Amino acid sequence: MKAVIIVEPEQPENIGFIARLSENFNFKVRVVRPKFNLKESRTTANNAQEKLRNTEIFETVEEAVKDLEFVVGTKPGKGVNSKNFEFRENTSIMLGRESSGLTKEELNYCDALVYIDADYNSLNLSHAASILMYEAYDSKEPGVDNSRLNFIEEEYGPRLKQLISRANPTKEEIDRLLGELK
């Protein structure tokens, strides 16, 4: 399953637009602590009203990502240029508040970080979502089971697992790495 997770959105219009995008690119919509009633997003959701009704609301980022296989977070200038990132079929996307993005703590729940290369480092939330959801949708790479790296977390700690995850290794690279470590 892949989802787009929006943390503390401030503008209802953006959630309506993101519901429409999710309908087009086959993402589930998850929202963490919205600053408004989601019903306010109806006008921009157009024909994605059912997607909007099925939007899941969470109290914490941890709850929103716990059942997802691979989560990519966004931060201007941090991580990998989204054009060069190898999105996989199980990649979920997490975006932050319109005014300030994701916090450092929230980024810790991400397996990888990407940024969108642009002349100005701030995009509208729904516009950023559209670029990343299209790039993920366009990907033909099979998903990598990130849970296979749990051995590394148990043996060497969460930081090493996070470092390896953020490198976005292929299945073959994970197989090779696990073979060397065991």
Give short role names for the model-derived ranges.
Residues 1-182:
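Post-transcriptional modification and biogenesis factors for structured RNAs
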